[in-house]
Amino acid sequence: MDLYIYYRVQAADAALFLTKVSALQDNLSRLYAVRTALKRSPVAQDGMHTWMEVYLAVNEDFAVKLEQAVAASGLSSLIDGKRHTEQFLDLSLCV
């Protein structure tokens, strides 16, 4: 299963947020051997960018570990609103 998590962050906080979320993903990659990606919308709207964290081929328990790591990281203080999580299966592996 792959996780795609998106949310909005003030454009003015982009540099600080990038530092924090990159450290989070590096740590999760090291601890749980997951592949990660980080994306951001190219243009800010209303002073905000949409960001997306991607976690590929994770097991069902990873989501709990991820939320614990996010809570400990302080990311939530820089996010406007909620983190939205979508789960997807790679169908090329399921066929």
Model-inferred region functions:
Residues 25-29, 70-79:
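A common structural junction motif
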Residues 1-67, 87-95:
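Short S/T/G/P-rich N-terminal loop/turn motif that feeds into the first structured element of a domain
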